[in-house]
Amino acid sequence: MSSDIQQIRIGLTNNHPCSYLADRMERVAVAIDPQMQTPETYEVLMANGFRRSGDTIYKPHCDHCQSCQALRIPAPDFVPSKSQKRLLKLLSQEFHWQLKPELDEDWYTLYARYIFARHRHGSMYPPNKMEFAKFARAKWLNTQYLHLYQGEKLVAIAVTDLLPNSASAFYTFYDPDISISLGTLAVLCQLNYCQQTKKQWLYLGYQIDECPAMNYKVRFNPHQRLVNQRWRG
């Protein structure tokens, strides 16, 4: 643990089937001290591998698996790949984004279409407004919604936590009928925001190499992974 937080009280959940790897069991450590729930402390906790779901701050604590690795991008040093440069060009020509404190009125239609098309067998199914609000918001955190538009059409929303020196890509949903990589485009917008506001890091959550749906994260370079409590990369 960073020297900024010497001790933290945690509680452990029971083992249950992993949401990402079918043959694994998962367990998480949950921070149970309310004083941990501040933007400044949460930023330190993220640098030590923690993440949030709603107001709950947690970290994987599995008995026989270390596949989850926190991943972050040093925003000032980011160098787009050829395919990312093409997306950035498309962004300047056809798309625009805006960070908002609240969701657009038509957000749920987009969210429901995304869940039905991409996550029918996941924990977010069936889509539910109240459950999404509990999942996406933390009362102690500045959470903003990055809205991505193609012309006037809303095509993606990236829930983004803003911390003193970093941002966290919390959850993204998008139009499942658009063929370009809207998830990658949303991350490029978040990186753009970090660079504009001089934030050092964009956290992308956990990377699991065995999970193909997550492998878009490692295409952002340079990036760092938290391995054995050290950031490497």
From Swiss-Prot:
The broad enzyme category this protein falls into is transferase
Keywords for the protein's UniProt record, in alphabetical order:
Acyltransferase, Cytoplasm, Transferase
Query: What Gene Ontology terms for biological process does this UniProt record contain?
Result: proteasomal protein catabolic process; ubiquitin-dependent protein catabolic process via the N-end rule pathway
Disulfide links within the chain = none
Q: What is its main location?
A: cytoplasm
Q: What does it catalyze? A: N-terminal L-glutamyl-[protein] + L-leucyl-tRNA(Leu) = N-terminal L-leucyl-L-glutamyl-[protein] + tRNA(Leu) + H(+); N-terminal L-aspartyl-[protein] + L-leucyl-tRNA(Leu) = N-terminal L-leucyl-L-aspartyl-[protein] + tRNA(Leu) + H(+)
Matches recorded under NCBIfam families:
PRK01305.1-3, PRK01305.2-2, PRK01305.2-3
Q: What does this protein do?
A: Functions in the N-end rule pathway of protein degradation where it conjugates Leu from its aminoacyl-tRNA to the N-termini of proteins containing an N-terminal aspartate or glutamate.
* PANTHER family xref list: ARGININE-TRNA-PROTEIN TRANSFERASE 1 (PTHR21367), ARGINYL-TRNA--PROTEIN TRANSFERASE 1 (PTHR21367:SF1)
What protein name is recorded for this chain? Aspartate/glutamate leucyltransferase
Taxonomy of origin reads: Bacteria, Pseudomonadati, Pseudomonadota, Gammaproteobacteria, Vibrionales
